[in-house]
Structures are given as structure tokens and as C-alpha cells.
Amino acid sequence: MDPTQAAVAPTGDLPEIRALADQYGALVMVDDSHAVGFVGENGRGSHEYCAVMGRVDIITGTLGKALGGASGGYTAARKEVVEWLRQRSRPYLFSNSLAPAIVAASIKVLEMVESGAELRDRLWSNARLFREKMSAAGFTLAGADHAIIPV
């Protein structure tokens, strides 16, 4: 398995990683905590952005960033993988369920993400403006063209 994270560059070289995984019979796992909600044409994350939807074996993410700012997270995978994690993942076994309000807020945010590109477009416009103004003020900015801008 090759875990990759799309935090700094939204691509994470996923097409190349997927090709290598296919060649060697490996699984591909992506931590998309910094991409789901605003990366990709429909905000589905780096796998959508890189045109490998349906070809990433395990996607993990958080509900604490673009999906509402609450707590909690998720793992999306085949049923067998999720069941194995439910039985073997100690943090999962010894954690509490999410509060209903957090679940409801996250569902609402997912509905907003699916409803259109207006919020994503505004985010990207704000990120470009921030990057432009901070650079003009003499700050050195790290990272690629991403809504998360390390200063």
C-alpha cells in the first residue's frame, strides 16, 4: 500500500502512483483531509482532480477542515477494508461516536459542496488574492496553487 497525502499539491502524483500500484499489485491510500470539499471540479478531492475516481482503494479525511470545522473523520474503502478497520483499529475501537450535531453539520456541508461551485470559486478567488497580496508584501509562501497557503 502506498499512502499519499494531497496537502501541499492537490495532485499527489496520483496517476503515476496508481499506475505503479497496478503494476505491483499494491493498494493506494490517500489522506484527502486537505482536498475534499474544494479540490476537483465538484469538490470531491484529489482523486477527482487527478481523474482517478474509483481507482483509489482507501480515502481518509477529516470532518474538521472543509467539511464543517467539527471533529471526527472517515475512511472510504471497499466493505472488506472498512470491516477490517472496524475490528482492528484501536483508535476506532476505543473512541466515542460522533455527536449527532456534528454528523448533521457534516451532512449539510456535503450537500453544500454538491450544490454547485459558487463557494469553491469564491474560496479559490480569495486564496489567489491572499497569495498575491502576501507575496507583494514580501512574504515567502510555500506550497503550490492550493487553498491552504503556508506562510
Describe the residue ranges of each PLM region.
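General beta-strand structural signal in soluble alpha/beta enzymes
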Residues: M1, V28-D32, T60-G61, F94, ...
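Active-site core of PLP-dependent enzymes with the aminotransferase class I/II
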Residues: M1-G25
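Short, small-residue-enriched loops and turns at beta-alpha junctions
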Residues: P3-V8, A35-F38, Y92-L93, P150-V151
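A short glycine-threonine-serine/GTX helix/turn-capping micro-motif
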Residues: G72, S89-L98
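Amphipathic alpha-helix from the class-I
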Residues: A101-D121, E132-S135
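Conserved PLP-binding catalytic core of the aspartate aminotransferase-like
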Residues: D121-R128, A136-V151
